[in-house]
Structures are given as C-alpha cells and as structure tokens.
Design a protein with these regions (language model features):
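A short, hydrophobic C-terminal helix/tail in secreted or cell-surface proteins
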Residues: 243-247
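Charged catalytic and DNA/RNA-contacting regions of genome-maintenance
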Residues: 1-242
C-alpha cells in the first residue's frame, strides 16, 4: 500500500496465517523474522490487546522444517579475535551440536568453508580483521563488545553447562574459542530466548588431530557438492540405519 504517498511502502510484515507461505522464503533469503502474537485474551480486556515478540527466526537459528535440510546441519557461528589468534564456535540449535576451535585466520576460514554457517556473530571491533576475506558480510550480526571479556565468557560457559571447569570437555580454560562459544549462548538467550538444555556438550576441533583440506581440494573430490545430482562422496555414508552419519 502507498500509505497516502505516491510511492510504495516496502513489506514490513504479514498476517500470521501467511506464516507458512513467507517464513522459509524470507529466512532463506537472509532476513530475520520476528513473530508477534497477542499476549492476553481479548475477551478479558477492554483496552487494546497487548502484543509482543514471541519468537525470532534467523538464518542460523531455526527449527522450522521448511528451512532446515534433513541431511545437513544449520550452523550459527561466532568469531572473536585476541592477540592475533582467532576463535570460532559453531552451534546447530536443531541438533545441539556445539563446536569450538582456535587458530590462524586461514585455519578459521577453512573451517568456515567446511561448516557453511548461515549466520555469523561478530563484534564491530573485530570486523576489521575479516575485511579482506571472501566471507559474505550479509551473514554477519553484530554483538556488543562486552561479550568479548574472557572472565564473563568463562562464567557464562560454566553457568550454562553447570560445571566449574571445561577440563571435562578436554578444553583448556585459556582457549580463546570459549569467548565465541559464550557469544552464541548469550545471543540465543537474550535475542531468541531459546531454551538450550539439549546443548549439553562442547567439542573442540583440534588442528593437530584433524585433516584439513582447502576449498579447492574439497571441491575437486566432490565431498560436499557434486556436479551430478546425488554424486557427492557423503552419499556413501547416508544410506545407513543410523541418523548420525548423515550429519557428520
């Protein structure tokens, strides 16, 4: 509608009954969708019914079947920088898979290429370190700098997992990737108000115990994608009785 002017007004919202039609299209296009609902019974009030945001659907945080792919993780990532080292964490909210790592910029970029996160949390303070990379900046969502405080991050990690140390996960307490892991937890609890009880384990991706491949090798071996439908190498472990191999 023109709203009384000679130019069109961009779409800002749509009725709830059209949710199934538009939600997956908007989120797959990289947009963030806030779902607003009535917060009180209209029969019990004579005033305007209160409405509020009850859910926030973003590219990296969704449980909608139309958005998720059954044989592919949907990762939310977070990146932080400290003393020329990069920390990276990845969480699939739908499965609870939670990973962290640390290393050089090239190593982190290699992990990003392999995991293909749909949304990336980063502070504007650290953005300059990624300015010359080929990461799609439209995937970025900026978080506050206070989340980068190491002590704050450690406390958040301890509180979430109800532990007094991360040694049980095989992770050194000085691992800077813990900051990015905490960023994800803060973001989901504050912006999305998600219950994360199913996120009960944190796994470190260690460069010394991993076989790293650059994007050209992965492409040439057709591990994740193939020029022919159904021809990628991961198809070989998808025909199993267990669901785990399809998301390895």
């Amino acid at each position: 509608r023109g709203s009384g002017v000679n130019k069109e007004t961009k779409l800002a919202g749509f009725p709830h009954h059209s949710l199934d039609t538009y939600l997956h299209k908007l989120v797959k296009a990289g947009h963030r969708v806030a779902i607003c609902e009535q917060l009180e019974n209209p029969k019990l009030t004579k005033k305007i019914v209160k409405r509020g945001v009850t859910d926030l659907i973003t590219p990296g945080v969704s449980l909608n079947d139309e958005i998720l792919t059954s044989k592919k993780n949907n990762f939310l990532a977070a990146i932080n920088v400290l003393d020329d080292q990069f920390g990276l964490s990845l969480l699939d909210v739908s499965t609870g898979d939670f990973f962290l790592s640390r290393g050089s910029l090239n190593y982190i970029l290699s992990l990003m290429k392999n995991f293909e996160p749909k949304e990336i949390l980063i502070s504007k303070k650290d953005l300059k370190f990624l300015s010359d990379t080929n990461i799609d900046k439209s995937f970025f969502f900026y978080v506050d700098d206070w989340m980068l405080n190491f002590n704050t991050a450690l406390k958040n990690i301890y509180d979430h997992f109800n532990v007094k140390s991360v040694k049980g996960f095989g992770i050194d307490k000085n691992n800077i990737g813990l900051i990015s892991a905490s960023m994800i937890l803060f973001y989901l609890k504050e912006s999305h108000q998600k219950k994360l009880s199913h996120v009960n384990k944190l796994i470190e991706i260690n460069i010394t115990s991993s076989l790293m491949m650059d994007r050209f090798t992965i492409s040439n071996l057709e591990i994740l994608h193939s020029k022919n439908e159904g021809g990628k190498s991961l198809i070989a472990v998808s025909y199993t009785h267990l669901t785990l191999p399809t998301t390895l």
